[in-house]
Each structure stands twice: as C-alpha cells, then as structure tokens.
C-alpha cells in the first residue's frame, strides 16, 4: 500500500486518537495476561499432582481467577474503545468523502459514476471500518500472542517446542495459498458492485419507462445476472477461505498428538525430571495460542486485502482535487446582473477534439431578458453553465457584474445566480422545506407570493396538507409541470441577480408560461433573466434573442429583427405558428 493512501486515512482518526490508543493498551495487557495464565496453570497442576498444601493451591487458583477477570475486563474495554474508535473513524471518512464530493465540479463528477460514488460511501467505507477495527484489535493481538507464546513455549517445554518448527511452516504456507487464491475474487466483487448499483439506480429512476414498456422481466433478468456474478465470486472466495478451519484443526491435532506422545515418553523415561505434567498442559495451551494467532493473522490478511481495494477507491475520491477553486483573494460581492462573454470557447476536456462552444461574444445588461433558441445539441445549456462557473472556459472569459467569474468566491457567485433546469430536482420533505432551499428564512407569506408568481399556489392549496404536503424523493408524487413550477418558485425566493431558466417551462401550457413570465417582470425587474426554450412564444417578448447553431451564436436580435434576418428562427416560428402549440400542463 502506498504511504500516501495510509496518510490519507490516518488523518481521519482525528478526535478518536484517544480510544484508538486505549484499545491498543488494553489489547497488550490482555495478551500479556493470557500468556501468563498457562504458566501458572502448570504450577497448579503440578501442585495438585504432588499433593501440595491446600492453602497454596487456593492461592494459585485465586491468582488465576483474578488474572482471568482482569483479562476479561481488558478484552471488554478493548471492545468498547475499539468500537468507538472504528465507528468514529468511519464517520470521519464518510464525512470527508461526502464533503469532497460536494466540492467537485461537473468535470470531477464525470470521472466517477453516481453508482460508484454511492458504493464508495457505503460498502467501501464499511469494509474500511471493519479493517480499522481488526488492525487496532486483532492485528495487534495476533502477532503479540504469537511471539509471547513461542517464547513461553520454549521456556516451558524445551525440546517439545520443536513441534512448532513443523507445524508453523505448514500452516503459514497453507494460509498464504488460501489467501492468494481468494483475493482475485474479492477484488472482482467490488468492481461488480458498481455495475450492480448502476443497474439498480437506472431501474429505479426509469421505473415509469420500465412499466410503460412492460420490461419488468427483462430488468429482473438483468439484475439477476449482475447479482449472480457477485454471488459466484463470493462463493468461490468463501469456499477457499473455508479451508482455513480444516487446516487449522489438522495442525492443532498434530500438535496435540506430538506433545502428548513425546511428552508422555519423556516423563516415563526421565521419571518426571526432564518435563512434568504441568509443562505438558501449558505446552498444549501455548500450542493452541500460537496456531490461533496464525489463523487470526491469515484472517487479517484476507480482510486487509479486501479492504485495500476499498481504501484505494476511497482515496481516489479524497485525493481528487476539485478543478474549480477559489482564487487567493476572491471577490465577495456581485455588483449587478450584467453578463459578458468575451471571445469564449469551451470544450469539456483538454483532450477533446471539438469545441462545444466557439467564438462567443455577448453583452447582457443587468435586468435584461434574454431568450436562447436552438436545436438539440447546439450547446445552449453549456453556454449558461459557464455563468455560475459550473465549468471554466477553455479560452476567453465570462464576466458577471464586470468581474471575471474566476475571480469570485464560488459561493458568492452561485448565490447570485439561480438556475432552474428542465429536469430539476425536488428533495424528500415538505413543500415548504423544498421552497426554503431558495431562502431558508423566508416567511410563509413570501413562500405563498413566490408560488403565486410561479403559478404554483393553486395546486399546492388543493393538496390536503397544503404547503406542508410531503414531496417524495425526486418529486415522484407531483407532475412534471408542478415540479417545474415549484422549482421556479424556489428560485424566485432566492431573489438572484441572474435567473437562468433552462427549458424549465416545457411541461406547462403556453398560458401558464406567459403568466410566469409576466410575474418575472413585476417581481424581479432588476434581475437578469436568461430563458432557454424550444417555443418561440416563451422568448418572443425578450429584449434579446440568441439563435444557437453548432456551438455558435448564428444570429441575435429582437423577435421582429430575427424574423427578418435569421432563416433558422423564421423557420422555427413558422412551424410552431402553423402547427400550433399544444403543450399541456
């Protein structure tokens, strides 16, 4: 494992250093006592065999009971502090990953699929939490137990301890073979989890389409195949790992037979002078401790190898540097809603061959209403995404309020810009809670006023609980038109300097669309309004209309000017006026 990855996770211990260190101390104390218990047990056995004084036997017995109680207490405390440390560690990792994702630009997000990020935040972090718990408990306990037990076995058993020269290499070799065989399957599982989660996410998001095309059986089979792939890999890995137990039992029984057979002969031939019954008893216990510690080490190896893949995946997110950052001395106030594009060209990645936008020169005065029309794939949305700096331009500059957007504090800039998308998102909670994303301190009267302007107040009041009605995740219990109007109301509550509507009235009828635009003129006259639309009726009263074609502005002007100068605009207008506009709410 690379030191950089380890360093990334060590930082996440933070305020849980104390329980982590206490866990290590308790484990060391527990192991030390556990290793001493067989030593005193040997004395007790010999004393009983020799018919020693009862008081002395009771004294040794009480010492053993006290040691067992202290060992139990240390083990319990180690479990408590270890659980606290590992849970806190996992919480910090989860929080750090989530915080990092929140800072990502779209370019960063594009490197990871949504399903992959969900897997890293859940399954991968759970694996790392388990690994952390094993490291601070078993990974300390097993090596200490192994070393201390071998030392005590040679002190107590002498020649008998040579059994470990045979047993340990056999067990180690077997455990290494088992781990080497199981690891590829465990690694494959995590990659397949991403694909499984992608399938689940896609199915849930597109449930209406799935049911509309009666594709439930196909989706079940698709999910079943992905699930079976994971099952097969896990089954193979678990079958291999299951060989741990029989291998362990074989070594334990071999050790017992060797110690009892050779030890008994030594007692008989030496008359108990070379070795005694108590020593044989302790040798059996030390042998068990040595072999158990080796099995624990093998379990740690398997678990850490599994977790290593998870750690790498989490570290990829934590070490991913956000492409968009604040400058050293950011501007923290937006003067007005004016927007300037100066020789702007843009492509989504440095390696891309084609520019999504090219040669954009545009001035939008503060408070103006600008309409943008164009066919699918003409980069209308890309153009407006440069204003709140969701992406950085490849060439040229974008200015808001006369200042390059790259010079602003990101939060300040984005707080001054409200964007309403065609497929905007509502979050699980009440309507009030969703609306207050625009202004968390908005009064009930302000909520109602914004909703009246967005033509949402009537349908909200028709719900049994009104503004306290619950919105399901993603807004699945409201229609497309209702969702768009709620999102527009949310944006109005923000009272932004720039309002961007990205085809966000596509699901409402033309009358409602006109009423919403009339509300903009009365409620936010000083706000710059940029409206992307497919319907000419949605933008014909704008101060300026842009016609986009192939990532360029092919024409601009008022409605009347474009009817005269732009063939594309005139053609769209004639098609819509002749065919009629039949969009319904």
Roles of regions detected by a PLM:
Residues 15, 19-32, 43, 133-189, ...:
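Transmembrane helices of ABC transporter permease
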Residues 50-51, 87, 95-119, 123-125, ...:
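Short intracellular "coupling" helices and adjacent cytoplasmic loop segments at the cytosolic face
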Residues 52-56, 148, 152-166, 236-313, ...:
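Helix-loop-helix
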């Amino acid at each position: 494992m690379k030191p950089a990855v380890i360093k990334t996770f060590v930082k996440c211990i933070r305020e849980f250093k104390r329980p982590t260190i206490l866990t290590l101390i308790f484990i060391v104390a527990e192991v030390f006592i556990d290793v001493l218990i067989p030593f005193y047990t040997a004395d007790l056995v010999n004393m009983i065999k020799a018919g020693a004084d009862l008081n002395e036997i009771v004294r040794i017995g009480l010492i053993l009971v006290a040691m067992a109680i202290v060992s139990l207490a240390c083990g319990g405390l180690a479990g408590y502090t270890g659980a606290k440390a590992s849970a806190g560690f996992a919480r910090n990792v989860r929080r750090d990953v989530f915080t990092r994702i929140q800072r990502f630009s779209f370019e960063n997000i594009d490197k990871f699929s949504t399903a992959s990020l969900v897997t890293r935040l859940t399954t991968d972090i759970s694996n790392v939490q388990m690994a952390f718990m094993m490291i601070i408990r078993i990974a300390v306990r097993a090596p200490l137990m192994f070393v201390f037990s071998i030392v005590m076995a040679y002190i107590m058993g002498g020649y008998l301890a040579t059994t470990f020269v045979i047993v340990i290499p056999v067990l180690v070799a077997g455990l290494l073979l088992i781990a080497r065989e199981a690891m590829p399957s465990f690694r494959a599982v995590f990659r397949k989890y991403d694909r499984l989660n992608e399938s689940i996410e896609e199915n849930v998001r597109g449930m209406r389409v799935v049911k509309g095309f009666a594709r439930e059986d196909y989706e079940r089979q698709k999910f079943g195949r992905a699930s079976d792939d994971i099952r097969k890999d896990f089954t193979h890995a678990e079958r291999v790992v299951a060989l741990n137990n029989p291998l362990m039992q074989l070594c334990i029984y071999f050790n017992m037979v060797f110690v009892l057979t050779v030890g008994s002969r030594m007692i008989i031939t030496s008359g108990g002078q070379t070795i005694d019954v108590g020593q044989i008893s302790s040798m059996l216990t030390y042998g068990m401790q040595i072999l158990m510690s080796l099995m624990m080490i093998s379990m740690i190896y398997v678990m850490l190898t599994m977790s290593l893949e998870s750690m790498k995946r989490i570290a990829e997110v934590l070490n991913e540097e956000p492409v968009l950052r604040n400058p050293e001395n950011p501007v923290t106030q937006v003067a007005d809603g004016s927007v300037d594009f100066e020789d702007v060209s843009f492509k989504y990645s440095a390696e891309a061959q084609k520019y999504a936008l090219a040669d954009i020169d545009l001035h939008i005065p503060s408070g103006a209403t600008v309409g943008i029309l164009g066919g699918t794939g003409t980069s209308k949305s890309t153009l407006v995404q440069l204003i709140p700096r969701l992406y950085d331009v490849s060439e040229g500059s974008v200015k808001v309020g006369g200042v390059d957007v790259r010079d602003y504090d990101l939060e300040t800039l984005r707080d001054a810009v409200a964007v309403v998308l065609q497929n905007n998102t509502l979050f699980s909670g009440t309507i009030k809670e969703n609306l207050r994303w625009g202004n968390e301190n908005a009064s009930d009267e302000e909520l109602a006023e914004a909703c009246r302007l967005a033509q949402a107040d009537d349908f909200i009041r028709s719900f049994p609980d009104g503004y306290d009605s619950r919105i399901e995740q993603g807004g699945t219990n409201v229609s497309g038109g209702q969702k768009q109007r709620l999102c527009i109301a949310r944006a109005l509550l923000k009272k932004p300097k720039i309002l961007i509507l990205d085809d966000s009235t596509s699901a409402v009828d033309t009358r409602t669309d006109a009423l919403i635009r009339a509300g903009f003129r009365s409620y936010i006259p000083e706000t710059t309004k940029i409206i992307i639309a497919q319907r000419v009726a949605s933008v014909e009263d704008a101060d300026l209309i842009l016609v986009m074609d192939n990532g360029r502005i092919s024409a601009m002007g008022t409605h009347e000017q474009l009817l005269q100068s732009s063939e594309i605009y005139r053609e769209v207008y004639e098609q819509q006026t002749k065919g009629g506009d039949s969009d319904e709410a």
